Amino acid sequence: GNNSEEETRETLDVPNTRYDDTELCFLTRDESEWSTLEIFAENQSSDSDNISNAVFERNDRILQAYGVTITELKKATGEHHGSLTNEVAAPTGDFQAVVTNTVNSASFASNGYLWNLNADEIEFMDFTKSWWDGNMAEGMSIDNRLYFATGDLLTSDNDATFVIMFNKKLVKDYKDIPDLYALVENGEWTMDELYKYEQLAVQDNNGNGKLDYDTDICGLAYTGDVPYCVLFGGGITLCTKDEDDMPIYSLDVQRADDIAEKGKLLFSKDHTINLNDVVNTGGITMYEAGVKTFGEGHALFMGEVMQCVTRMRVADVDFGILP
């Protein structure tokens, strides 16, 4: 058994070279809930969270093995984009890599600010290795050029994975809702099922003819990005690739129309609450709106990213997670 494991274990394929006294600095994000946590940690202690301790240990191993010190230059939202633009225009050498979001990544790449990671001079980056997100590398390349990637280096891409949370108490209150985990395991968790259960939960407690986030109960609370995820989750893609790795428009119009029609039902105002509307009219933050609506039992389901699972732990709500 051990021999087989050794034969199949992936190798790093990086030469045993020392780069003593070299500093590798990442331009990172200082953006409230989306601050970069995975590049640099000041120290390791029992008071630190698991991610910080793992980051510190990884950076120390890199220092010991290769002589490279990992640092970061953290910039706020309004300065992050400009920092890279200025560095390209007038290089200072203050940083060599950047952690950013996909919107900035596309802008940086189209403006020629980033290295092509598939170029011959970029060695030892094999995106078929399991620690890289191979699907992203394959999907984001154009003409065999790739300008950004993600993988085990970051946790923020996992935090940004969209899920559906459900209130376990409310599920028990509605006898017509079955074991939701069993639906998933049996391949029966569909948009039609979600729509059916959303409608069961609606309670206009204050009788004003609309669903309020702080008094009523809705079937689904969601933010503005969730409808896009319904399209992606429905298998909708705009492009495929040809043999030269060039994008080809290939939208399945009929399927897209079918999914859009289901989306109109899922997000109908008579059984949902759009948290963006709550923020725009209620004078509260998105964090407060989410915790109040879902965390205090005013929504059966809530659609958002995995990071909101962590945020919701401040609330007294017993909830589960569905795809």
Task: Place the predicted regions along the sequence by residue.
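Glycine-centered hinge/linker elements that transmit conformational signals in sensory
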Residues: Y195-E198, C229-L231, I236-G283
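Short helix-initiation/N-cap motifs at beta->coil->alpha
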Residues: K74-L84, E188-E193, N276-K292
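Extracytoplasmic "Venus flytrap"/periplasmic binding protein-like
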Residues: A65-S141
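Short, polar/charged alpha-helical segment
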Residues: S35-G67
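Extracytoplasmic/periplasmic substrate-recognition and gating elements
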Residues: M312-P323
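Paired acidic/hydrophobic, glycine-rich loop segments that form the ligand-binding mouth/hinge
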Residues: Q96-V99, G295, A299-E304
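Short, low-complexity disordered leader/linker segments with a strong preference
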Residues: G1-D21
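Extracytoplasmic/periplasmic solute-binding protein
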Residues: L27, T92-V98, T102, G139-I164, ...
